[in-house]
């Protein structure tokens, strides 16, 4: 009799466990079915916001240069709503690419492109915004009915995160992997050549912004990582914020081996820096090691997919013996073709 009661208790126990497991399975299946049935897709952007994606992504754009260039790198030119004003490289694409060249421009768009209303008029239902502008700027589009995803690319990890995110948004994860692998292969080429480089052979490099020689790249900027990857030491490594204002005394104190001007659109050029009397004792000026990024088609020192070229060029500039065989025009052709579908040369670029 005791054995019978024991058997009954064990059987009831198993039954309860089985029923509980079935309840869990049913609950999970119901939740999953609801999501599939509603077609809802949620993505967390680089501000940590949960964004519900449109059921069908019709037209897209970006409010800043980085986001726009990433759309090209991810192969989404067919979904871009208008010719974004994001640099000479994409202006060149508009000349050679029939589809992109046929899109509305900022001037031809009836309501412009700098407001949610203007984007809605162009059929945009997804926009990529700049993390640095904060949540309020992004929510402005969200509140107008446009799904808004904030992205940032100040580090390689952030660039890769953006690529994976866009891969999920546009359902092309394989392209995200290609973008990441492409950049990583070039970074590894640089690091393998500089492996074992002694600390004393790492020159101090001052990277200046479009504001001129008295603006410096800080530790929180892409340019800092660019210099470090290229085998240098960022002169502004102790600074914070973005493009910190500096003085002649700061530059004299740092005494950089190289000064790199970030853009041909800046207020200074090589000759004006070499002629700056306040900097005549600085090593880079005395040795005429003042340089400017050579691209005529878009920036190589901003957080952009093609900025891997800026790293290669910087490495070749400050460590010429390690990169003597690297042809920058050939490298530019390769990178631009990967991103835009056209070589640097085909787009009319010169170095």
What are these regions (language model features)?
Residues 2-15:
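Bacterial N-terminal signal peptides that target proteins for export
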Residues 24-27:
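C-terminal motif of bacterial Sec signal peptides marking the signal peptidase cleavage site
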Residues 29-31:
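Bacterial signal peptide processing site
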Residues 43, 50, 136-215, 236-238, ...:
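Extracytoplasmic substrate-binding proteins
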Residues 46-48, 103-117, 154, 239-248:
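Short helix-initiation/N-cap motifs at beta->coil->alpha
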Residues 62-120, 126-131:
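A short, structured surface patch at a secondary-structure boundary
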Residues 113-123, 144, 246-255:
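Short helices/loops that flank or line small-molecule/ion binding pockets
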Residues 216-242:
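Alpha-helical, coiled-coil/dimerization segments enriched in small aliphatic residues
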């Amino acid at each position: 009799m005791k054995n019978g009661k024991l058997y009954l208790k064990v059987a009831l126990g198993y039954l309860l466990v089985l029923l509980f497991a079935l309840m869990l399975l049913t609950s999970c299946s119901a939740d999953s079915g609801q999501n599939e049935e509603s077609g809802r897709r949620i993505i967390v952007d680089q501000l940590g916001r949960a964004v519900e994606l449109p059921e069908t992504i019709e037209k897209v754009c970006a409010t800043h240069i980085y986001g726009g260039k990433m759309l090209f790198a991810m192969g989404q030119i067919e979904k871009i709503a208008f010719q974004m004003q994001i640099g000479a490289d994409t202006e060149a694409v508009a000349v050679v690419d029939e589809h992109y060249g046929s899109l509305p421009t900022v001037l031809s768009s009836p309501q412009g492109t700098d407001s949610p209303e203007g984007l809605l008029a162009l059929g945009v239902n997804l926009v990529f915004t700049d993390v640095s502008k904060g949540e309020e700027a992004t929510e402005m589009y969200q509140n107008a009915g446009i799904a808004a995803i904030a992205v940032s690319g100040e580090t390689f990890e952030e660039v890769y995160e953006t690529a994976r995110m866009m891969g999920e948004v546009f359902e092309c994860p394989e392209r995200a992997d290609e973008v990441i692998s492409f950049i990583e292969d070039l970074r590894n080429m640089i690091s393998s050549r500089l492996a074992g480089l002694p600390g004393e052979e790492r020159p101090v490099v001052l990277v200046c912004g479009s504001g001129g020689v008295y603006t410096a790249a800080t530790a929180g900027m892409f340019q800092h990582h660019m210099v470090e990857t290229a085998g240098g030491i960022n002169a502004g490594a102790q600074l914070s914020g973005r493009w910190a204002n500096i003085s002649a005394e700061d530059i004299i104190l740092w005494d950089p081996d190289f000064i790199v001007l970030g853009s041909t659109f800046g207020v200074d050029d090589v000759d004006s820096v070499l002629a700056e009397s306040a900097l005549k004792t600085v090593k880079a000026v005395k040795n005429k090691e003042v340089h400017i990024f050579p691209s005529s088609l878009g920036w190589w020192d901003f957080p952009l997919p093609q900025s891997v070229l800026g790293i290669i060029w910087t490495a070749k500039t400050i460590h010429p013996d390690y990169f003597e065989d690297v042809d920058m025009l050939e490298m530019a052709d390769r990178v631009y073709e990967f991103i835009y579908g056209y070589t640097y040369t085909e787009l009319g670029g010169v170095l």
